[in-house]
Swiss-Prot record:
Organism this protein belongs to: Xanthomonas campestris pv. campestris (strain ATCC 33913 / DSM 3586 / NCPPB 528 / LMG 568 / P 25)
Keyword Protein biosynthesis belongs to the record: yes
Residue numbers binding (6S)-5,6,7,8-tetrahydrofolate: 108-111
Catalytic function, reaction form: L-methionyl-tRNA(fMet) + (6R)-10-formyltetrahydrofolate = N-formyl-L-methionyl-tRNA(fMet) + (6S)-5,6,7,8-tetrahydrofolate + H(+)
Protein name per UniProt: Methionyl-tRNA formyltransferase
């Protein structure tokens, strides 16, 4: 079975490896190299690096809408195109080019959290479970019928990065199961997504990571977890902007204004919120590295009342 794989970030690498392990991946599509790092040099995507290591031809078109891009894809004579966090829109002509169409590995239990950031939005919303769907792609945004799915619980203190890694591995397994069925001549039964329960996981940006202490502590704690390791929650603490890498909500009654430092110890720095308090455990000063609350207090000798 001739497979064309399309993906870009780390999340897609496990699925590429699963596809290449037992099947013929004739080409990999990934986004063009982007400037990255302090030197802003052009950097290949994680998927490109893995494909090169496997000797798989790599294509990096700016768009798939051109006649030339479609002709190139058709010339590969794919039986199936597997798409995992690719980042480019697939027009109808591309969706129809492979014999079996295009499959997508999506990191949510569709129709909940269609869109670009399902992992982070699930944590931010306080979901207790999520999962991975293998979907037959169609023109709509993550609207296609589901072929296979797997469900997992979200840990109480699980971060976006930790859940990302678990779902990347789970997605690779679900894809492997689907490819195994197709190779055996068994096409997975496509289940249309229900009309109820549709939500959208809008793309993350740094502005969303700025915390407002007037919000409930529980919501802020979820955002700290969701936005770790990117874009990383940030807030004003004791007069300086810091990034928050670890925090928990406290069910603590108080009469203080949001943003007031309530207490501090080796266990964390407690900050008044609109409801409850947020205990900051790991944080990062501008230009520094992530440190514990205890190390932060040692560095902030100007806060004797909190020591």
């Amino acid at each position: 079975m001739r497979i064309v794989f399309a993906g870009t970030p780390d999340f897609a690498v496990a699925s590429l490896r699963a596809a290449a392990q037992r099947h013929e991946v004739v080409a990999v599509y990934t986004q063009p190299d982007r400037p990255a790092g302090r030197g802003r040099g052009l950097t290949p995507s994680p998927v490109k690096l893995d494909a090169i290591a496997r000797g798989i031809p790599v294509f990096q078109p700016q768009t798939l809408r051109s006649p030339e891009a479609l002709a190139t894809l058709r010339a590969l004579q794919p039986d199936l195109m597997v798409v995992v966090a690719y980042g480019l829109i697939l027009p109808k002509a591309v969706l129809a080019a492979p014999t079996h169409g295009c499959w997508n590995v999506h990191a949510s239990l569709l129709p909940r959290w269609r869109g670009a950031a399902p992992i982070q939005r699930a944590i931010e919303a306080g979901d207790t479970e999520t999962g991975v769907c293998l979907m037959q792609m169609e023109a709509g945004l993550d609207t296609g019928p589901v072929l296979l799915s797997q469900r997992v619980e979200i840990g109480e203190q699980e971060t976006g990065g930790q859940l990302h890694d678990r779902l990347a591995a789970l997605g690779a397994q679900v894809l492997s199961d689907g490819l195994g069925l197709l190779r055996a001549g068994i096409r997975p039964v496509a289940q249309p997504q229900p009309a109820e329960g549709v939500t959208y996981a809008h793309k993350l940006d740094k502005a969303q990571a700025r915390l407002d202490w007037a919000q409930p502590a529980e919501e802020l704690a979820r955002r700290v977890r969701a936005f770790n390791p990117w874009p990383v929650a940030e807030a004003i603490l004791a007069g300086e902007r810091v990034r928050l890498h670890g925090a928990v909500a406290l069910d603590l009654a108080h009469q203080q204004a949001p943003g007031t430092l309530l207490a501090a110890s080796k266990q964390g720095i407690d900050i008044a919120c609109g409801q409850g308090a947020l205990r900051v455990r790991v944080l990062q000063r501008e230009g520094g590295k992530a440190i514990t609350a205890a190390d932060y207090l040692n560095a902030r000798r100007d806060l004797p009342a909190l020591r």
